[in-house]
């Protein structure tokens, strides 16, 4: 299922303002990670939610890859967004199996020395940026990346609601960025409007933004819907991608698998899909 991103210009067309209800996207990802504690759901959910809205800022065949290294450098979060709206994200195995997760908050896990690494661009041209996380907050520190790396004042907001059993109820995200020449204070006006109307984006449907321009104008003084894009979970894994894993096995391991008539299984850590390599496929490796 696709989640629609509404793209608007506000404040006299000086601010680009996007918003999305990405509940379905996060639901799909949480179903693949249904046993993780709430702190990890928040880490993964906030990261993917922000990448979902940022997919709407990409063009052509652009891609944005994000790696968050927490204060314990063994713990990492990965996410990727493409211009076509495909989004994926996961936590590394060391973080998933870290001790004491039930007792730690999202802020505790991020810590004071976490780092964000971003690779952005197309196949022909990419650049890498690394920024710190002074806010110990996924959303604010990804916004800080735009300020540090692109010198572009940016505001990001993500709201994720869970029930008493830590099951997802809803998820919304928004993105606001000043266009060249816009007064810096406009971003503060956007933040204040959101704080004053915290429920607005749980009521407005992004795909119906054109019918709600009046409500947006009430919040921002002026608003114009300029388009839509989609955002959806997409892993993109294939069986062929895992052949490299087979070639990394030793000759002894391959022979043992053949002698014991055992298939070899490869597990995708992003979507959870399992690929089985049968005896005929394994024999070709020798």
Where does each model-flagged region fall?
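Interaction interfaces in information-processing and related assembly proteins
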Residues: 1-225
């Amino acid at each position: 299922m696709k989640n629609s991103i509404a793209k608007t210009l506000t404040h006299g067309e000086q601010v680009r303002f996007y918003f999305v209800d990405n509940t379905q996207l996060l639901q799909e990802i949480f179903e693949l990670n249904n046993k993780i504690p709430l702190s990890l759901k928040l880490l993964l959910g906030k990261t993917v939610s922000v990448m979902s809205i940022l997919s709407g800022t990409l063009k052509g065949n652009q891609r944005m890859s994000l790696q968050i290294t927490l204060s314990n450098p063994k713990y990492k979060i990965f996410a990727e967004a493409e211009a076509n709206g495909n989004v994926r994200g996961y936590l590394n195995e060391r973080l998933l199996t870290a001790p004491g997760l039930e007792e730690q908050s999202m802020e505790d896990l991020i810590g004071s020395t976490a780092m964000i690494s971003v690779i952005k661009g197309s196949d022909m041209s990419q650049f890498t940026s690394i920024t710190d996380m002074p806010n110990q907050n996924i959303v604010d520190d990804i916004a800080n990346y735009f300020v540090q790396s692109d010198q572009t004042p940016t505001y990001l907001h993500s709201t994720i609601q869970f029930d008493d059993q830590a099951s997802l109820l809803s998820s919304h995200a928004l993105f606001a960025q000043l266009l060249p020449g816009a007064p810096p204070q406009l971003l503060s006006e956007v933040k204040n409007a959101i704080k004053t109307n915290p429920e607005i984006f749980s009521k407005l449907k992004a795909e119906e933004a054109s019918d709600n321009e009046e409500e947006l104008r009430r919040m921002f003084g002026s608003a114009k819907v300029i388009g839509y894009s989609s955002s959806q979970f997409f892993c993109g894994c294939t069986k062929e991608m895992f052949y490299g894993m087979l070639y990394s096995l030793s000759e002894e391991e391959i022979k043992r698998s053949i002698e014991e008539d055992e298939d070899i299984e490869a597990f995708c850590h992003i979507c959870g899909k399992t690929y089985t390599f049968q005896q005929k496929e394994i024999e070709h490796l020798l």
